[in-house]
Design a protein with these regions (language model features):
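Conserved binding/catalytic microenvironments
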Residues: 50-195
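Interfacial/linker helices and their anchor residues that mediate assembly or domain coupling
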Residues: 2-91
Length: 195
């Protein structure tokens, strides 16, 4: 089995059409084109490299765990990484992050258009790029945090309109960062939170 055949099989496990709908990758029906687009998107020479869990070390809040979901998760994380590249951040500063947590907590009563720009700016000053992404079916993801170069990326999903979930996910990811869990192999599930 050659690399293209193997990659075509792997491409079927990714939510290609949904990713294209969000504008993350070009639309196509051709399976070889899909593979080429996905290789470019993930910045790999072969999609089979995505099977190596070391390629993306993340800490995340997931609602379920499925193998197909792992590929959707990788796609979502890659989009967070791409968006974060356009966000200028100061050097990572944990003391400042800990200092601003109480101020961020006071924003829970504000509307998103009021708090989003302010939180993004405050976190950028701590070396954290905050990005918001659409929910990708199969990823069961609420949020993720990981290192990318000299910054920490926090990605949050726009899944659901529940403000409580947003704030829980944001503080959950910030706790991962403060506690040094950024780069954990597996995220937390709803079951973990109940235990």
């Amino acid at each position: 089995e050659n690399a293209m055949d193997k990659d075509e099989a792997l491409a079927k496990q990714l939510p290609y059409n949904e990713m294209a709908k969000f504008g993350w990758i070009p639309e196509t029906r051709d399976s070889k084109e899909k593979v080429m687009n996905l290789r470019k998107y993930f910045e790999v020479v072969e999609l089979s490299l995505l099977e190596n869990k070391q390629i993306t070390r993340i800490a995340c809040r997931r609602l379920a765990v499925t193998e197909k979901g792992d590929f959707a998760l990788l796609a979502w994380v890659q989009e967070a990484k791409i968006k974060a590249r356009n966000i200028e951040t100061s050097p990572i500063n944990m003391k400042e992050l800990i200092r601003i947590i109480p101020e961020i907590r006071t924003m829970t009563v504000l509307k998103p258009k009021e708090f989003c720009p302010k939180i993004k700016r405050m976190l950028a000053e701590c070396g954290i790029a905050l990005v918001f992404l659409s929910h990708l079916k199969g990823s069961f993801l609420q949020g993720a945090s990981f290192m990318d170069g000299n910054k920490i990326v926090v990605g949050l999903t726009a899944r659901g309109k529940d403000a409580d979930k947003f704030w829980f996910s944001l503080f959950h990811e910030l706790a991962h960062i403060i506690l040094g869990h950024t780069g954990q192999m597996d995220g937390t599930t709803d079951q973990d939170e109940k235990d």
